[in-house]
């Protein structure tokens, strides 16, 4: 992980997307965007499952993509509370891999468990990540 020296062009991009997200759910939000950091993954590198529970939301910008690139995944820590027959009937899985590509931004609750699968390409995988805290919020 590397800190970004000048995030002045990145933060407005995330801010605009977070505002669009808030509009979609019918909320007016004032948020604090924390300084982003760069994640790089060389071949065979990965990220263990973790969360950002000390923040309301986290965001990831995907800087590049390729064949056999490491994949972001989310884990459902509540799956074990569903009876096995419900898990089978509704084909519930405890891991979900969102489809993302270069330039995509994904924003998710900070408490969600997530990780990155092993990188299998010689090209370095790059993402920018940051945390978001909600200062004020109201329903529209």
Protein language model regions, located:
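Acidic, low-complexity intrinsically disordered segments
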Residues: 10-25
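A generic structural micro-feature
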Residues: 30, 51-55, 120-124
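Hydrophobic residues positioned within well-ordered beta-strands of beta-sheet architectures
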Residues: 34-36, 57-59, 126-130
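Catalytic core of non-heme Fe(II) oxygenases with the double-stranded beta-helix
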Residues: 38-107, 117, 134-140
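Flexible glycine-rich surface loops and low-complexity tracts that mediate binding to linear polymers
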Residues: 109-111
């Amino acid at each position: 992980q590397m800190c970004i020296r000048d995030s002045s062009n990145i933060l407005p991009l995330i801010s605009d997307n977070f505002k669009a997200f808030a509009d979609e759910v019918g909320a007016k939000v004032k948020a604090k965007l924390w300084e982003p950091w760069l994640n790089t993954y060389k071949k065979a590198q990965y990220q263990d499952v973790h969360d950002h529970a000390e923040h309301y939301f986290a965001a990831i910008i995907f800087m590049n993509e390729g064949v056999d690139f490491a994949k972001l995944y989310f884990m459902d820590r509540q799956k074990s509370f569903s009876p096995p027959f419900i898990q089978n009937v509704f084909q519930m899985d405890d891991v979900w891999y969102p489809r993302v590509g270069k330039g995509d931004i994904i924003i998710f609750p900070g408490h969600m468990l997530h990780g990155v699968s092993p990188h299998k390409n010689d090209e370095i995988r790059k993402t920018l990540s940051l945390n978001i805290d909600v200062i004020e919020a109201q329903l529209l």
